[in-house]
Amino acid sequence: MQHRISRYLYIRIFFCLIFVGISSVVFAQKEPHYTQYMYNIGSFNPGYVGTVSTPEIAGLYRAQWLDIDGAPRTLRVGTNVPLSNETMGLGLNVISDQLGPSTQTYVELAYSYQFNVSDNAKLSFGMDVGGSFLNVDFSKGTFENPGEPILNGQTINRFYPTIGAGFFLYEDDIWYLGASIPNFLTDGLYNDEVATIVDDKLQYNFIGGYVFDVNETLKFKPAFLVNLVSGAPVNTNLSANFLFNDRFTLGAAYRFGNAISGLAGFQVTSGTYIGYSYDYNTNPLGEFSSGSHEIILKFYLGRGDGTNTNNKELKGKPKQIDTPRFF
């Protein structure tokens, strides 16, 4: 009975956070963003690291605003490894984000520690440290005022250290809530002749999701992601996915004031998942762009011995692979 009451409480918290995200009006996103964020949580929340049943490797590529020269292109490769004591985890993120004449590459190592907060729920705290390599080649751009001193064929190369943190509260394959700050260090990019070029600010990320069992073969998986940056509009993402027979995923997403999306995924094997999404812009960019494409590939490696105290039954899966998460 107590477990059932707590389950209803978490559902209420989940929908309340969605409402809070929609009603916020003073922030926005500056980190690379993803339509399939629910399968890519480790890229922006180190608290997620180590919460999976088996080690996993994920790769994602996003081509944004097709037909627009210099539009963003993002490539991410990440690893997520739960340690043998099942209370700690390690992760590695490598993200390359291209926009116009600039390329920014993030390399970060994450660590998390988790503990039980109830019989079924766990709380994980994580931190990541690393750096961002920024390259800006102004000779590749077309500018309104080409006579500016900084545009005389100059190339900027900078390294910026990064320190981030986050928490992830979850119950395996049922629900999750998380919050994170990708980088506490907010040094801007400056030039002596033109003052500030890029003014960096803290970003806050809030995420949540729930898995509803509709029947034995169908699951409903709503989720949200809110990105907040001081002084800019909110970036709110809502998604609804349906999982059929633990193998096929179909869904839709909406980014407020920005885009609507279609999502599809397929569990190729018990250890391989591939997902795809297409965004159609609902803002004025839709007149100039044919949309955005995103593809993700995940590999669940297993621990080699088929044992995991969090998953007593392997449910017909190969011995080395535990059941993949429904998140």
Where are these regions (language model features)?
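Subset of outer-membrane beta-barrel
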Residues: Q29-F327
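Bacterial Sec-dependent N-terminal signal peptides
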Residues: M1-E31, A240, F326-F327
